[in-house]
Amino acid sequence: MNCPAMTASPSSSSSSSYSTFRPPPPLLPQLSNDSQRSVVMHCTRLPFEAFAATSSNRLLGKHSLPLRAALVTSNPLNISSSSVISDAISSSSVITDDAKIGVLLLNLGGPETLDDVQPFLFNLFADPDIIRLPPVFQFLQKPLAQFISVARAPKSKEGYASIGGGSPLRHITDAQAEELRKCLWEKNVPAKVYVGMRYWHPFTEEAIEQIKRDGITKLVVLPLYPQFSISTSGSSLRLLERIFREDEYLVNMQHTVIPSWYQREGYIKAMANLIQSELGKFGSPNQVVIFFSAHGVPLAYVEEAGDPYKAEMEECVDLIMEELDKRKITNAYTLAYQSRVGPVEWLKPYTEEAITELGKKGVENLLAVPISFVSEHIETLEEIDVEYKELALKSGIKNWGRVPALGTEPMFISDLADAVVESLPYVGAMAVSNLEARQSLVPLGSVEELLATYDSQRRELPAPVTMWEWGWTKSAETWNGRAAMLAVLALLVLEVTTGKGFLHQWGILPSL
């Protein structure tokens, strides 16, 4: 694959006569260009040494965030302007000939066979960033994960069986890594690219061991999640923090982390290209509602833990629609969240509810865009392509389309390569020409500080007390829920420790 240069956007074949239908039905939340999220303001206050407010022409206009972190954990570089960057790269000490550069791609992982499904689910639910228990009950994390994984495995196996018996995520991520390696070499960066999965092989620990064996001296950590969330990039980075703290070799390694990259021009243009291409397959492209479906997270992650995911997702959709608008594509669009698990409230609107409501409003043409996924896996191939498509057709939507995940799309891979080059601690003569394009960076060990800063100015006054119609406060309901959870956990502990009980009788838990 040849890394493409950034080119002008293709002209749109879509008519703008349907612009009167924008924004979409008011019952769904609509993103407006003037509703800038507080995350943008918060990022300017991050207390790291290296900080630059750049107006990159590779980050899109007013949405660009300033550099917000140390570039090297052991030797941070103060940057105040592009002239300083130019001075730094002209120095003879930037990247030496004996430097060994590595790129670590982080992703979720997925079961490759049906036998892998239950242990994969166990690894997933054993992660405290996925199921957040109070500290005093964290000893129940693994028993609870065992219970949930065993209970959910049969249905999950059906889903994986319907897409070929396993997840294609590893194969696709390996292909992305190889294309990224080739692209970096074309950009005169002789880097090795590694894949570390959070919940299945090759695990992050395996990738780190290979990095050490290869003698890597400069490492760029790149989560394959465009938007940052506690439960995705955050979980992977916390694991890396633990690994780095326990290893002297890693502690002394210069490394850079790119926590999110949804604002990059290449990524935005690549997404817009895919959307434009799929719109062209409809009989009336300008009458299609663009339906962005993102993986959801519990609402408490955003409101209580300070997760910036919702703000970054909404801004990402804004950026893509602005790019499409430049191409005279002015379709209606909306954003919803999928893959909700359990009884707690997640980010809304839920994808299934939003699809149903659009059908009731008379929408006949719908184009689904898996906005938070860069690889095909069960949530695109089964949840969107099968479940949501079937729901859409039942709801009255006549024409359904789905934008493919980015995969190894050349512009996307080239932009990732540029992100790596631009984030190297000392770029040197190997860099591409445009060095002002710098995404937001944090060193390992800064995940908590990052989240704290996002949350620092969110609310100065406590929210008003919400009273449910039956007379209890939301806080009381929360504590009632916690009490019920503790009762369930106590029963689960008894089941696990004694090997007896109704869960064993029903075959949900294996007998000892």
UniProtKB/Swiss-Prot annotation:
User: Which principal EC class is assigned to this enzyme?
Assistant: lyase
Q: Where in the cell is it found?
A: Plastid, Chloroplast membrane; Plastid, Chloroplast thylakoid membrane
The record's GO molecular-function terms, alphabetically, read:
ferrochelatase activity
Keyword Chloroplast, does the record have it?
yes
What keywords is this UniProt entry annotated with?
Acetylation, Chloroplast, Heme biosynthesis, Iron, Lyase, Membrane, Plastid, Porphyrin biosynthesis, Thylakoid, Transit peptide
User: What are the recorded Gene Ontology BP terms?
Assistant: heme biosynthetic process; porphyrin-containing compound biosynthetic process; tetrapyrrole biosynthetic process
Q: What induces it?
A: Down-regulated by wounding or oxidative stress.
Which CDD domains does the UniProt entry name for this protein? Ferrochelatase_C, Ferrochelatase_N
Q: Name its pathway.
A: Porphyrin-containing compound metabolism; protoheme biosynthesis; protoheme from protoporphyrin-IX: step 1/1
Please give the residue positions where the record annotates the modification N-acetylvaline: 84
Tissue expression remark: Expressed in leaves and flowers.
Query: Which reactions fall under this protein's catalytic activity?
Result: heme b + 2 H(+) = protoporphyrin IX + Fe(2+)
Instruction: Fill in the transit peptide range.
Output: 1-83
Write the Enzyme Commission number(s) for this entry: 4.98.1.1
Database matches in Pfam families: Ferrochelatase
Instruction: Please state the span of the N-terminal signal peptide per the UniProt entry.
Output: none
Which cellular component terms (GO) are annotated to the entry?
A: chloroplast membrane; chloroplast thylakoid membrane; plastid thylakoid membrane
Question: Where does this protein have compositionally biased stretches of type Low complexity?
Answer: 9-21
* Membrane topology value: Peripheral membrane protein
Q: Which HAMAP family match?
A: Ferrochelatase (MF_00323)
Which family, according to UniProt?
A: Belongs to the ferrochelatase family.
By its UniProt entry, which PANTHER family does this protein fall under?
A: FERROCHELATASE, FERROCHELATASE, MITOCHONDRIAL
Q: What does this protein do?
A: Catalyzes the last step of heme biosynthesis by inserting ferrous iron into protoporphyrin IX to produce protoheme. Produces heme for photosynthetic cytochromes, and for proteins involved in abiotic and biotic stress responses. May play a role in the quality control of individual chloroplasts during photo-oxidative stress through regulation of heme biosynthesis.
Its protein name is Ferrochelatase-2, chloroplastic
Q: What organism, scientifically named, is this protein from?
A: Arabidopsis thaliana
Which gene is the coding source of this polypeptide chain? FC2
